Amino acid sequence: MKPADPSPVASAGERIAPSRLQRLANTAAGIGVVLALACGALAVGASSAHAAAAIVIVNLNEPGVGFNDPTPATPVGGNPGTTLGQQRLNAFQRAADIWGATLTSSVPIRIGASFEPLSCNATSAVLGSAGANEIWANFTNAPRTDTWYPSALASKLAGTDQATPGQPHILARFNSRLGLFPDCLPGAGFYLGLDRNFGDGIDLVTVLLHEFAHGLGFQTFTDDETGEEIDNLPSIWDYYLLDNRLNRTWVELTPAQRAASAVTWCGLSWNGPIVTANVPRVLAPSSNLTVSGAAAGGAAGDYQVGDASFGPPLSNTPVRGQLMPVVDQANGTGLACTPLNSTNALAVRGNVALVDRGTCDFVVKAANVQAAGAIGMVVADNQPGDVSGLSGNDPSIAIPSVRVTQTDGARLKEALQRRSRTRSGVVASLGLNTTRLAGTDAQGRILLYTPSIYSPGSTVSHYTTEAKPNQLMEPSINDDLTHEVTPPRDLTYPLLQDIGW
């Protein structure tokens, strides 16, 4: 990446204002993270008066818009604001207070913030963006020389403000039109309450906690697509990004090797000691599909699975039964998008149903096989790729469901070629792997998000989506997140501690 300004601006260090800031985008697959460029001028804002680190929200909006929008609003969820603008500012301040009470710094942290119209349409929208405004190397008291640090962290470590005079440490902008207009994701606006009772809305405080973390340093400044460093200097992150196949950190790898590890599923671990020590306190055992039985053949063994957001979670008491496929299409696949016919219902009754992804929602498939008497459901992906979960919500689903890759699904189907109407001789057991925590490598280190298909802005600078419980710094904002950033619920703050906070 071409640096914006490679020249020294202070006697003790070098500064760059990078254009790589994080943007949350609402897509068909959920909330993802892409790249953005943000800049702005300063104005007076509010501050956290009693925090271990004072965080100042600097209002960048002009009169009458954004934080200054006078549209009347009814207080909601502990947010006492009576205008839309004041409620927005209160939500920002709540997120700032949570981080301020967690961090320590003698230098107030300034977040330049605004609400403004961002890209959106009726089905998708950019939610907002936030990230470090500047990065610094070789400043006073820098723990590592020739290493990039985000502005807020560099200031904390130096004990004096490193930011360019008149500039914030973090920039944040969010979509002022979201959910308020028919051409901007109608019905899915920001929930401005402070109590997480967001219903069908998007909890702004949770999104802000995530985005502020990026600005505080939860990101690498090395180009994760090309592996190239800025001015041939590593980010502080790169000392803790471990290619677990090569057992080497990013600072020890070539650009090509870094780029390769960024698209190797489960191939990149966080090697920081504070995060690793807290992993057992935070993460739960991983979900697992074990296949056995006289007819299993080459399909026997353990399978990595994606969990469902509906139905009961897998537990230490496995759900175990014959694996039986649903076949309701002329090509031999089984979608289970309509009530099962008598042949398929007989096959899955009292057994674990194997169905294919496609055409209808996962909860529809689960409801149909459950109605036919299945005790569990395995969904085989219909596209190449990594393990993913099953989205959806239906409180009537009472059977466990998991998802396997297209490759693993093909292995299972091959083993099921010879079967009777009610038995396959292939036994599926849906349970937990108590020897492996969800989202970790073989050494118990948490994994970073490295999908095999590069995802701009999401790849590397997030935790894996395999973690359980869901973590704040996954690339998607999940409904079960709390406003906690510390153990025993969350591993965001331990990572910031690893890099110097």
Name what the model sees in each region.
Residues 44-51:
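Sec/Tat signal peptide C-region and signal peptidase I cleavage site
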Residues 272-454:
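Structured lumen-facing ectodomains of secretory-pathway proteins
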